[in-house]
């Protein structure tokens, strides 16, 4: 196959047509996969020696949550270093990062792989990866043709990232600084609640307002505070953390405001408090609802007047500190109960943010699971850690009262258990590796299969036919929707349906 001028023109038009939309990256990767007829493709952004998936097609959903560090993925490192088209032979000894991550083909290793590094000028900004199950799948394309695709994709990615940068900074095109890849935060999630939270973070980060971050335990409030600080004008100065719940009353005031030598028994020298440490930066007060009323009054004075007094000192010190506070309590209820000052609540909650619990974030649980799987893979030196379909189903139906923190611990424990029961450096997480209490999975809508004399192949094909028919009926005969429901690739589903006689 060779690309005609019309085909290349159509690709360019399609890539640029969606560039201002939220689904810009998915449109790009879907178009390229259709043209190149590959089993799986991914668009990756390069940042700090790791590749971050922006869009995938034909790969398991948890890939979007993974962060591919170059030192743990020799193929991706080769792509980053090459500066040109990279073709990996079918018998390459370098492990493919997507082995076990193509739905419906978990037991098979990727055979054909092409990597296209994407550049903006001399800067590496990303990569396009193309994978196939047939060893010679990409032999029909010349390197020159693939370079053209890479150039088109690089231009589209560069423009899209620049637009995203301008949107996040609320800048006009004429005010734009030279293109820089956006900083990666570990706030992983594409659910509506997380998308809205990220937008609100972008809005408030550019200001100097105090922010109250509320959310259940384990939802990631500290990550929100970090994201606000890193996107703010104060990012070059310190972000200082203090857990108010861990402060004994006897030392809480000293921790916040510091003390002078001799202020109390054990004060053998002058000591700066957290407010002084955070001067010109940001102070994150976690579990703010645990502060005593006496300390709340002193904190209020700092927010009102911008000065502090060290314990044992009559002099005031001016500080310029932005305060971010977090709580898992309902502070309005605490105010009504007399346990939290109303005036302090209003000072802190100038711009309130609410972090959604994991049970309300839909498929984000799978993205986060992928992120933690990749962390475990690197930490334990494994070649791959993947989720079985049963494990994904279990994770999606568990309520996670401990939220993201509970998911992280569950993945780490499951990897250790799975590794202990399997030799080698490949780990597949099954449902039985998770110890969740009282998880009720929806009953499968199994078809009534008559008991007849069939061999195993015939029985398997009969089951596959009925499963595909049910999926098609439930999805109004939409093949793409049926493929998503069955967690398989739409191209593979088409091929299977043809083999089973379900379509021409």
Curated annotation (Swiss-Prot):
The keyword Ubl conjugation is assigned to this record: no
Domain Sigma-54 factor interaction: 187-416
Pathway: Nitrogen metabolism; nitric oxide reduction
Disulphide bonds in the chain: none
InterPro entries xref list: AAA+_ATPase, GAF, GAF-like_dom_sf, Homeodomain-like_sf, NorR, P-loop_NTPase, Sigma_54_int, Sigma_54_int_dom_ATP-bd_1
Gene3D superfamilies hit by this protein: 1.10.8.60, 3.30.450.40, Homeodomain-like, P-loop containing nucleotide triphosphate hydrolases
Sites of 4-aspartylphosphate modification: 57
CDD domains the record matches: AAA
DNA-binding region: 479-498
A biological process from GO: phosphorelay signal transduction system
Keyword DNA-binding part of the UniProt annotation: yes
GO MF entries: ATP binding; ATP hydrolysis activity; DNA binding; DNA-binding transcription factor activity
Keywords, sorted A to Z: ATP-binding, DNA-binding, Nucleotide-binding, Phosphoprotein, Transcription, Transcription regulation
Domain of life: Bacteria
One Pfam entry name: Sigma54_activat
Coiled-coil spans in chain: none
Binding residue positions for ATP: 215-222, 278-287
Its biological purpose: Required for the expression of anaerobic nitric oxide (NO) reductase, acts as a transcriptional activator for at least the norVW operon. Activation also requires sigma-54.
NCBIfam families reported for this sequence: PRK05022.1
This protein's name: Anaerobic nitric oxide reductase transcription regulator NorR
Species of origin: Escherichia coli O7:K1 (strain IAI39 / ExPEC)
Gene: norR
């Amino acid at each position: 196959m060779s690309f005609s001028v019309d085909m290349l023109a159509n690709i360019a038009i399609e890539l640029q047509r969606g560039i201002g939309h939220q689904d810009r990256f998915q449109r790009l990767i879907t178009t390229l996969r259709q043209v190149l007829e590959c089993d799986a493709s991914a668009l990756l952004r390069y940042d700090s020696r790791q590749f971050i998936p922006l869009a995938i097609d034909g790969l398991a959903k948890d890939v979007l949550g993974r962060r591919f560090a170059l030192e743990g993925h020799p193929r991706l490192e080769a792509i980053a270093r090459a500066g040109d088209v990279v073709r990996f032979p079918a018998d390459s000894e370098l492990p493919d990062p997507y082995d076990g991550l193509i739905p419906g083909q978990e037991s098979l290793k990727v055979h054909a792989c092409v990597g296209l590094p994407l550049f903006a000028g001399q800067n590496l900004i990303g990569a396009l990866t193309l994978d196939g199950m047939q060893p010679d799948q990409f032999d029909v394309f010349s390197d020159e043709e693939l370079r053209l695709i890479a150039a088109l994709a690089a231009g589209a990615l560069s423009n899209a990232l620049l637009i995203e940068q301008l949107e996040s900074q609320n800048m006009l095109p004429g005010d734009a600084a030279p293109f820089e890849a956006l900083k990666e935060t570990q706030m992983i999630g594409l659910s509506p609640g997380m998308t809205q939270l990220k937008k609100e973070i972008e809005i408030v980060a550019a200001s100097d307002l105090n922010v109250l971050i509320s959310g259940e335990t384990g939802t990631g409030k500290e990550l929100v505070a970090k994201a606000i600080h890193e996107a703010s004008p104060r990012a070059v100065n310190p972000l200082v953390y203090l857990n108010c719940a861990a402060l004994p009353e006897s030392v809480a005031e000293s921790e916040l405001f510091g003390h002078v030598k001799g202020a109390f028994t054990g004060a053998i020298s002058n000591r700066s408090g957290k407010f002084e440490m955070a001067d010109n930066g940001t102070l994150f007060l976690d579990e703010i609802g645990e502060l005593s009323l006496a300390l709340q009054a002193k904190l209020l004075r700092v927010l009102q007047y911008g000065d502090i007094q060290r314990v044992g000192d009559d002099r005031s010190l001016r500080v310029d500190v932005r305060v971010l506070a977090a709580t898992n309590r309902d502070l309005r209820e605490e105010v009504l109960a007399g346990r939290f000052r109303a005036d302090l609540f209003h000072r802190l909650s100038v711009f309130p943010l609410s972090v959604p619990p994991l049970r309300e974030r839909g498929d984000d649980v799978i993205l986060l699971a992928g992120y933690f799987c990749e962390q475990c893979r690197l930490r334990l030196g494994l070649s791959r850690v993947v989720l079985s379909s049963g494990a994904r189903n279990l994770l999606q139906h568990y309520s996670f009262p401990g939220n993201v923190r509970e998911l992280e611990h569950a993945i780490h424990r499951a990897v250790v258990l799975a590794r202990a029961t399997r030799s080698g450096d490949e780990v597949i997480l099954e449902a039985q590796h998770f110890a969740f209490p009282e998880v009720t999975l929806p009953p499968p809508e199994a078809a009534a299969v008559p008991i007849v004399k069939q061999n195993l192949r015939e029985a398997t094909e009969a089951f596959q036919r009925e499963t595909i028919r049910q999926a098609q009926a439930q999805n109004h005969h939409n093949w793409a929707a049926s493929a998503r429901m069955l967690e398989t690739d739409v191209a593979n589903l088409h091929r299977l349906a043809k083999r089973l006689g379900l379509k021409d």
